[in-house]
């Protein structure tokens, strides 16, 4: 299998899909990455864990509709061109 731009884009799509399907109550809270209401204070930098949780929430919120469209296009292309 050749390493092409399409393969790279497909791998990126799979990674974004993996982040988008993480469920906060079923998976993330079991490993201790649930919602923390008391994170940080005034003038404190957020930690790495809170930044990763913010990234996961942002990807799930912002990328929901574009992921549906891109996944549909990818499925159609795979069905048409194998």
Swiss-Prot record:
Residues passing through the membrane, by range: 2-22, 62-82
GO biological process: brain development; endoplasmic reticulum to Golgi vesicle-mediated transport; organ growth; positive regulation of extracellular matrix constituent secretion; positive regulation of protein secretion; protein transport
Entries under InterPro entries matching the protein: Yos1
UniProt-listed Pfam families: Yos1
GO cellular component: COPII-coated ER to Golgi transport vesicle; endoplasmic reticulum membrane; Golgi membrane
Membrane topology: Multi-pass membrane protein
Domain of life: Eukaryota
Localization, UniProt: Endoplasmic reticulum membrane
The entry's keywords: Endoplasmic reticulum, Membrane, Protein transport, Transmembrane, Transmembrane helix, Transport
Record's keyword annotation contains Protein transport: yes
Family stated for the protein in its record: Belongs to the YOS1 family.
Protein task: Regulator of endoplasmic reticulum secretion that acts as a key determinant of brain size. Required for secretion of extracellular matrix proteins. Required for correct brain development by depositing sufficient extracellular matrix proteins for tissue integrity and the proliferation of neural progenitors. Acts as a regulator of the unfolded protein response (UPR).
Name by which UniProt lists this protein: Immediate early response 3-interacting protein 1
